[in-house]
Every structure is written in C-alpha cells, then in structure tokens.
Amino acid sequence: MGGNFKSHGNCSPVAEYNYWCDPHAAQITFEKLGCKLEMVGLDVTRHIVLTPNHLEYMSRINAEMTAFITKITRFYFDFHWEYEHIIGCVINDPLALAYFINSEVCSGFDAYTDVVTDGIALGQTVVDQYDFYHKAKNSTILTQVNPSLFWEDFLTVLLDAQKDIIQDDLKNLQLES
C-alpha cells in the first residue's frame, strides 16, 4: 500500500505516508521492479473507512476480536478526526491485502509513474495518466473500489464468520453514510 494519484496526502498536502518516509525506495521500486507495480493508494483506501457503526456490528459477531481492533485503531480514529474531521479511520493496509487476494475489489488504469525524492513535494507520486512522457507504463493505478465486496471479505475473515451471514447483515445495516 502506498502512494496517491488525485487524492490529497495523509502526511503532507501531496504525499502518502509510506512514500513520504522513503521516497527513494518507492522510486526505485517503480523503476526497477520489472513488472507493473499495482498501486493501492489513497485514492481507493479513502473509500474504506472503519466507523463506530462497523465496530458496533463487529462486536456482536466477535467481541474479542473487535476489542482488539478498537484498541489498535484508536490512534487512527483520533488522527482522522483531528486532521480531516472524519469519525472513523481509513484502513489502508487491509484493502491492499484484500486486493492481493481478490483483484475484483479494485480496478484502475496503467500509466508511467515516478516519485518525487526531494523538495516541497517529497514523496508525491507523479502519474502520467495521459502519456505526456511517452515512457513505458510501469504501474497500474487503482482508482475504483467495490466497498461492499471489501467489507464482505474483510469481515468474514476478521470475525471468523460465515460469508452468507455477513452478506445478509450488510444488506440490512447502514454502516456507511
């Protein structure tokens, strides 16, 4: 998980935290990987927000796991409230894992991508969506996500629950605004 295309950053106006921390590693990965890097960035992860409603539902299925999740996400709930006034937290890495397991969760487009390694835009991903640079496409930039599919898969695994029960519950619950 890392990077962003059109989304604002989460540690600077233009950079996602992982790429901001080590922009040289991110740049080298895009440059030397030898295949298209599939960028699960903030553009898709911002659509996956764990809310108090999710936690309440989860506690009814698996209270022990939910207590743990509540404890480890408290910092992120506080962060997103302080900086973005969101009551909930964006759970970036679970979406990357879900996409790795089931590529139908996200979709996007191929492009040449580079990473800014110094200056005010440190860590920003520069995505050449319109082929201005005429360079080989070294990435797939994920821009669309199916939140329903993500939540079905994520909650089924995390809560050790039956998928058909989770699917039915999600149809009847209002977990998102």
Segments predicted by a language model, with ranges:
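A broad, low-specificity signal for short, low-complexity segments enriched in glycine/proline
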Residues: 1-2, 59
